[in-house]
Each structure stands twice: as C-alpha cells, then as structure tokens.
C-alpha cells in the first residue's frame, strides 16, 4: 500500500511537471479571417486509445472552455470544430474552420479523466487578423501545427567486401640426393669432379718388375748352390 501511494504521488508530480512545461511553451499561429487552423496532437495508443479527447480554449480569466469531445466516435464535428481520433497512428487531428478575429486566444488538446485533464501538446496561441481585401482568405496554405511521432531512422548497412582467403604455404620436404637420383625425369650431371690422368705405361711396368725380381731371386739361389758345391 505504501509503495502504491508513493508511486501515485510521483505520478501526480510528473503530470504536474508536464502541465507546467506545457503552459510555458506555446505554439503561435497567425491566420487571416476565413482560414482554417489544423493541429495534430500525438497520443499514447497503449494508454489512451479508448479515452475521451477534447479541444479546449483557455480564457484570460483562467476559465477553461471545452469546445468539442470525442464521445466514443473517431470523428466529431461541433460547429466549426472538427476532431478525428486515429488510434492506429496515435494522433488526434483538430480543425477550426472559418476563423474570425474573436477566435483569437489560447487552445489545447487534452485527455479527459476523472481529475485534471492530461495535456497532449503545447497550447496553441491563435492570432486571427482581418483580411485586408474584405473577402475570406484562401485555405491553400492553412496554418498547421503538428508533431509527428518519432520514427526510427533507417539503418544503412554497408556491405564490406569479404577478404579473399590467403593461400596457405605448403611445406615440402627437401629432396635428398637419393630422391634426386631415383626420381623419374631427372638427369644426374656430376659436377666438381676431379679427373685423374693415369699413365698408360704403369700397367706394363709393374708386371715386368715382378718378373725381373722373381728371376733375380732364382738366379741368386742357383749361384749360392753352385758356390757351395765348388767349395766342398
């Protein structure tokens, strides 16, 4: 109960602050006689879709005059005042046609409730001037006071080019000499080979020396045997 009372008090203070701020700021609109005032008041669809909405005039003596009320209908016309409640757009459209100088004053659009009304938009200070030509002014450029519900800005997505995949380095084993020799299609060309020049007479001298040595040994042996036989 205490929490509910606190929240209720805070809500009342919040509403009073909004109303005080709304009374400070005014939208001024100057029109000539015969023209039409058009005002768009944003509403909260989730909260006030079924609430009564009204167009009021604030007199100089502080009196509030209710000019038109949406009595369960989306469109209401009372004399020169036309109200259209559009819950799907969260907007209350108001028109005052065939303006006269005596229509000059301060106006506001509100939500009617059990207590004080909830102000939907800044009060509009309407100033109606005499038409110098004496004929009704054209409605081609009526004064429009409106506030559109904030809409999210479009999000622009920039497509970035996808980076190309880099080729992965392939590690190959270093071929050995045996692999080079055994691999087909390779020709082995020996390099840095020292050429040895062989003398052609070596193959003849060595056998001749061996034969001469053996003959010399035989001759020495025969000489020793002969010398021993003569000595005896």
Curated annotation (Swiss-Prot):
Domain (Ig-like V-type): residue spans on this chain: 21-125
Gene3D superfamilies: Immunoglobulins
Keywords in alphabetical order: Adaptive immunity, Cell membrane, Disulfide bond, Glycoprotein, Immunity, Immunoglobulin domain, Innate immunity, Membrane, Receptor, Signal, Transmembrane, Transmembrane helix
UniProt xrefs under InterPro entries: Ig-like_dom, Ig-like_dom_sf, Ig-like_fold, Ig_sub, Ig_V-set
Membrane topology, as annotated: Single-pass type I membrane protein
Tissue specificity field: Detected in bone marrow, tongue, lung, liver, thymus, spleen, jejunum, ileum and lymph nodes.
Positions in the Extracellular compartment: 21-203
Transmembrane segments: 204-224
Subcellular location as annotated: Cell membrane
Main location per the UniProt record: membrane
GO BP, sorted A to Z: adaptive immune response; immune response; innate immune response; neutrophil chemotaxis; neutrophil-mediated killing of gram-negative bacterium
Glycosylation sites: 192
Region (Disordered): 152-186
GO molecular function list: transmembrane signaling receptor activity
Signal peptide range in chain numbering: 1-20
Spans within the Cytoplasmic topological domain: 225-232
Disulphide connectivity of cysteines: 41-109
Gene Ontology CC: one annotated term: plasma membrane
Pfam family for this entry, one: V-set
Function of the molecule: Cell surface receptor that plays important roles in innate and adaptive immunity by amplifying inflammatory responses. Upon activation by various ligands such as PGLYRP1, HMGB1 or HSP70, multimerizes and forms a complex with transmembrane adapter TYROBP/DAP12. In turn, initiates a SYK-mediated cascade of tyrosine phosphorylation, activating multiple downstream mediators such as BTK, MAPK1, MAPK3 or phospholipase C-gamma.
Quaternary organization: Monomer. Homomultimer; when activated. Interacts with TYROBP/DAP12. Interacts with TLR4.
Name recorded for this polypeptide: Triggering receptor expressed on myeloid cells 1
Name of the gene: TREM1
